[in-house]
Amino acid sequence: MEMINIQDLANEVDMSVDRLVQVCIKIGILKTKYDTITQLEKLTILNYLNENLKNSNKNVLMLKRKIRSTVKIFSSGGKNKCISIEIRKNKRYSKSNDDIKTFLEKNKDINLNKSEIVLSAKEDSKIFVSHSKDNINSNINDTCTIRKKFNKNFKKQQKINILSEKEDKNNLDNVLNVEQGSKKKINFKNVVLEEKKENKVKFSNYIKLSEKYNTRKVSNFLTSKNIRDHNNVEKHRRNRNKILRNKHQKDNFSFEKNLSDKNIKLDNCIHKKSIKNKKESLLKQVFKKPLRAINRNIILSSAISIFNLANKMAVKSSEIIKMMARLGYTVTINQIIDQDIAQLVAEEMGHKVTICYENKLEDKIMRDRDFGDGIKKTRPPIITIMGHVDHGKTSLLDKIRLTRVADSEPGRITQHIGAYHIKINNKIITFLDTPGHSAFTAMRARGAQVTDIVILVIAIDDGIKPQTIEAIQHAQAASVPIIIAINKIDKLITNIEKIKNELTKYNILPEEWGGDNIFVNISAKSGEGIESLLNAILTQSEMLELKSISNGMASGLVIESYLDKGRGPTAIILIKEGKLNKGDIVLCGFEYGKVRSIRDDLENEVNSIGPSIPVKILGLSGIPLAGDKIVVVRDEKQAREVATYRQKKFKEQKMSKQRQLKSLDIFEDVKRSSNPSLNIVIKSDVQGSLEAISYSLLKLSNDEIKINIIGKGVGGITETDVLLAAASNAIIIGFNVRADSSAKRIIEFENVDFRYYSVIYQIIDEIKNCICGMLSPKYQQKIIGLANVRSIFKSPKIGVIAGCIVMEGIIKRNSIIQILRNNVVIHKGELISLRRFKEDVSEVRCGVECGIGMKNFNDICIEDIIEVFETIEIKQ
């Protein structure tokens, strides 16, 4: 027997596969959309569909209307009564017999027409009324079969008929007029499509199968025990039909349109409110879950948040958080992670990662620079003077330059890095003067990085000091030669050999001992040995053969930067190679700009400058950081883009580092949450001093007091700085800067703690005092007396009283005591009673007998030792 696929049959009858499977289940054929059926099963399905199509013709249509209103009635008593009135109207519309005849003429081969079904239903109802408990007429089987078939399928066909007649508007050909309330007529347009010949055969076969099926149901009904069971069944059937009819009228008979091509349209004269039929939406969005993991190609350009990384990988953020937890990272959905970690997570989850470098523009702008002819020429040497504080570094430079810079410095100590150049024997030498204070470590490190030769100044009366050792370490790390200048030889102290011996510990050997270091004895006060030192510098520089490119675009290093009140951001730079011209576009760290002015160390305006010459430049967009590299570029727009990108990158790294530190120190923060802290706002004249002050103050933090620098900057104290300090209860520290008029008014109004300083160690000393005042004092117990127990008495009020003699010190009442027996402490308590004979006394001195009463202790023995303590407060 030929087998037919369910999907092919669905295409043949113009029906969805799922709908056809449901039809098969209704008639008892259990199939899925991938199964096949036989010819007999196909015939059964087609008969069922044709039966539904045949019975889709509806004869009766009921319309129900309700009108509610309220009527006010005036009574004689003056009170009004409201009566609710409800008017119900039922309209019944039916088709004429001519329409039924027309339908039957076109379906001659159908064995059972609609009129016969109605008549058989009436006879069937009479038979059911005469049904009794004893016997049942055997003819009921046939009529009940028809009735059951009609009751089951006729209502369904009525629903299908309404929808099919609505969809086929073009084939309406008949209108029925029915008068209102059995007199009015309504026009119907009814078109019956030509049924295919094969559908007629299928329908007749379906009738036979349905009769057999319904006969089985009736036989089950006839076996019911009594009439009451039958009445219950009949009542349930009627209620069910009524519910279905109301539901179908409410849903406007919305069924599959491919089962019929008929439609009904009521005239506008009948309808005051049109019936709105809604079609079932055929467009449905179906989500198909992927069967396997999808690996994507992810492009990572920079640091990225967890949320954005999840969007790129098309996964939930929680999955990435779980993955990072397994890798040992604790993150949140909005936390930013760096490029390396994001790449690791993406590759761990099976995705392919492509790294896109956003600094391509920076690389391009650096490659596009003009390096001139590339010929290197001899350049002046850069000499950095280093040493301990107050060893005479600035005085030595003043003697060489014939200036008096040291006399004008606050506290006679250098706190800024200075850059000068002088001409000796037609040769230029550049000097960098570095601070010697311990706070200026970063300045000394920058000086050692850019220098060619280091002059280490050591005072003959002081010898080797901590900053001397630090300067040696910086110079050795930069691999630059060191010339030792032993200063203050005008003092009658012969300590040179001792200094040489101490320097050997740090690999500094004089030439006469077979080493590479030149030792020169000088006096910055009298000028003795200065000429020898300069000759040693020139000799050492010739040996180094210092050369660089003297033309092309310049590049150098920022030595110091500050904000000039009249000129704006100013940077002291040292050109390493190339030539800097006025009007060049420069890129310096996070800043950029066009060079508006170039000034040398004597404040002379110059148009261009070559290598190894320190100058001041104006025109930058902001204050650069000391130590930033400065280069000349071609395009100002590209320089601005690179500077903006660097700022963005720096902020992302800073935020990521802060979040990481917070997550690592979360438990320590909980412990320290109750500890006090000191908030500070710092404003300085130059960038280097600001860096040194911040570094020194942060080192003062301890376990109990934490130093928080909530704001810092270069320039004068503004209104914004004062408001920040007032809001956070902070101290404002001004180093060689002053507050403007508006800031002074707010300082007085808000009573902000504001302090001026010109010497860095004054800041450190005062902050130390503030921290000591904030620390909680510590207490220490000190032994003030010893007593030996000689006898024991009993008192009804106090208890046991020890008769003692004071052996050392003094015994005071209400002091803390400690009882020792055989040099072992057996009790610690309080002395509550002290008597001399029968008098109460406050203290007893050495060699005097007394009676001592102790609190909550009676186990005292003769020859016990009583130690008396006093609590002393110790300030931190």
Swiss-Prot record:
Q: Enumerate the residue ranges of region (G3).
A: 433-436
Q: Which PROSITE patterns match?
A: G_TR_2 (PS51722), IF2 (PS01176)
User: Which Pfam families does this UniProt record tie to the protein?
Assistant: EF-G_D2, GTP_EFTU, GTP_EFTU_D2, IF-2, IF2_assoc, IF2_N
**Record keywords:** Cytoplasm, GTP-binding, Initiation factor, Nucleotide-binding, Protein biosynthesis
CDD domains the UniProt entry points to: IF2_eIF5B, IF2_mtIF2_II, mtIF2_IVc
Where is the stretch described as G5? 523-525
Keyword Thylakoid in the entry? The reply is: no
Q: Where is this region: G2?
A: 412-416
Describe the function of this protein.
One of the essential components for the initiation of protein synthesis. Protects formylmethionyl-tRNA from spontaneous hydrolysis and promotes its binding to the 30S ribosomal subunits. Also involved in the hydrolysis of GTP during the formation of the 70S ribosomal complex.
Output this protein's name: Translation initiation factor IF-2
